[in-house]
Amino acid sequence: MDNIMSAEYYLSLYTKYNSKNLDVFRNMLQAIEPSGNYHILHAYCGIKGLDERFVEELLHRGYSPNETDDDGNYPLHIASKINNNRIVAMLLTHGADPNACDKQHKTPLYYLSGTDDEVIERINLLVQYGAKINNSVDEEGCGPLLASTDPSERVFKKIMSIGFEARIVDKFGKNHIHRHLMSDNPKASTISWMMKLGISPSKPDHDGNTPLHIVCSKTVKNVDIINLLLPSTDVNKQNKFGDSPLTLLIKTLSPAHLINKLLSTSNVITDQTVNICIFYDRDDILEIINDKGKQYDSTDFKMAVEVGSIRCIKYLLDNDIICEDAMYYAVLSEYETMVDYLLFNHFSVDSVVNGNTCMSECVRLNNPVILSKLMLHNPTSETMYLTMKAIEKDKLDKSIIIPFIAYFVLMHPDFCKNRRYFTSYKRFVTDYVHEGVSYKVFDDYF
């Protein structure tokens, strides 16, 4: 047994020898009984350009064409993968099962590499020896036709002519056009003839993605494919994640002229489209949308402030669109550049929303940097009064604002002449500092 295994071992090494001699090979085989240890038949079926007589000798010696190697491959699968039709024919004539499935649940028909003539010859061979049509699906739920993501028109039509169904989808609901778009080099010409063969260019997959969704989500856009798919697809059609082909173009930072192409096919510009333009700071798209009749309002300005879209803020300002409480929402976002931009454009620091002020929100966020910027822009006495009320109501830490309030009172002596303001300020400070400190100075005002 050791001698048999040793002879097989040297026969496996012979696969790596460049100048193989059939007579030498036959002599080596004389000392061998198939053991299955080295998968000899598999190894020789995987040699490109090998004379099929080597495989024939192995088959005559008793090596089975219907055994798998350690990876679950059959000799017929291996020969199909490397496009050796002569070995494919040899295996089939010696009983290889054309419907055997490898670990990926693929039959030999799934492996269609080679020129059109070679692929068509292999298809004819497999079908001639009993390959079943529409009888297998791989791990992705694809039959051989659907698994071929980048077929030539001639091969595709050949596969269809022998009975394969073209109007099918994989387990994700993707049809041939979806899958072709996911290949390395999708082509408009391929999609064009697929459409002529009746494959839907607008069918959504199980996630709601049409082929146009897929092409619009790619980093590099194929304009020819977009032009081909546009007439049959609603650019506002949302997938289950809420994205449309139009919003996907915006999210992938596509050029304005391409987005305009999709906009030109739509009668409706949705609020979602506007919101995504603002989120990605696409002021150029806002301008295109505005030219098509879409009106903006303070809600759009507010969103631009919240997400920090400086270019969109500038565009809206130039078109006299503002939000009176913009500074408040800029503080909430803690985006200093936005705060600076609004201050530069003379937005008020006296915004009050639901009883909260810009300053009280700085205290809540523990942000002394933005607080100092706001205090330098002269909030009103009423604003400071409301700030103290909001801080006390929500029991916020006063330490961050006490120095600013003290300086404010010092610079605004009229503040303490208002009993309401003074009483609030006295209580605010008294509750903060240590017991025993005298506040008689306050009594001098009254």
Curated annotation (Swiss-Prot):
Function: Inhibits host apoptosis. Acts by associating with host apoptosome.
Protein family (similarity comment): Belongs to the orthopoxvirus OPG037 protein family.
SUPFAM superfamilies registered for this protein in UniProt: Ankyrin repeat
Protein name: Inhibitor of Apoptosis OPG037
Subunit structure: May interact with host caspase-9-Apaf-1 complex.
Organism, scientific name: Variola virus (isolate Human/India/Ind3/1967)
Alphabetical list of Pfam families matching this protein: Ank, Ank_2
Cross-referenced InterPro entries: Ankyrin_rpt, Ankyrin_rpt-contain_sf
ANK repeats: 71-100, 104-135, 207-237, 241-271, 296-325, 327-351
Gene Ontology terms describing biological process: symbiont-mediated perturbation of host apoptosis
GO cellular component, one term: host cell cytoplasm
Cellular compartment(s): Host cytoplasm
Keywords annotated in UniProt: ANK repeat, Early protein, Host cytoplasm, Host-virus interaction, Modulation of host cell apoptosis by virus, Repeat
Induction remark: Expressed in the early phase of the viral replicative cycle.
